[in-house]
Amino acid sequence: MIKLQKYSYLSHKYLILDTIEDCFSKKDLNFMHIPREEIGYIEFIRKDKIIIITYLHIYTSYRHKHYGYQVIDYLFSHYKFKCIVGETLKESRGFWNKCIRKYNGMRRNIYYSDNYTSLFVIPRQEISYKQIWDLLDYSYNIIY
């Protein structure tokens, strides 16, 4: 089970922590002082009930263990929003294509930065290109 912990000085950056709370009670965990493993980080902003993911990074030693899907599931279960919007890096196209299929999303052929190939919307929502462009512009102005 994973948890997101807010990074100390950035309001849009969260550490992804792996916990073992399924096996033990919180009282036992506090007694044992078992540290949570940091498996990566995610940067996202919420605006108008839409989550804009700017970066999701899982450390290489934790890849291929389905932590990316757990992060998306965590966002769905802990935040109230209509959809997730984000751009796709060339290296992570396979992961986001699987997420698009799994969560009934869609891909749009628009990108704000040269490093990215396209954009995704999970789950499928009717969003205009202008609204997507405004969301990406908003996120880049705040984060970068």
Predicted regions and their residues:
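Conserved active-site tyrosine of GNAT-family acetyltransferases
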Residues: 96, 100
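Glycine-rich phosphate/pyrophosphate-binding loop shared by adenosine-nucleotide-utilizing enzymes
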Residues: 36-41, 51
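Conserved N-terminal entry element of GNAT/NAT acetyltransferase domains
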Residues: 1-15, 138-144
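Conserved acetyl-CoA-binding loop-helix of GNAT-fold acetyltransferases
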Residues: 58, 64-77
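Conserved GNAT acetyl-CoA-binding A-motif
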Residues: 77-90
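Conserved acetyl-CoA binding element of GNAT-fold acetyltransferases
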Residues: 49-60
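C-terminal "cap" of GNAT-fold acetyltransferases
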Residues: 109-144
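Short secondary-structure junctions
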Residues: 3-6, 101-111
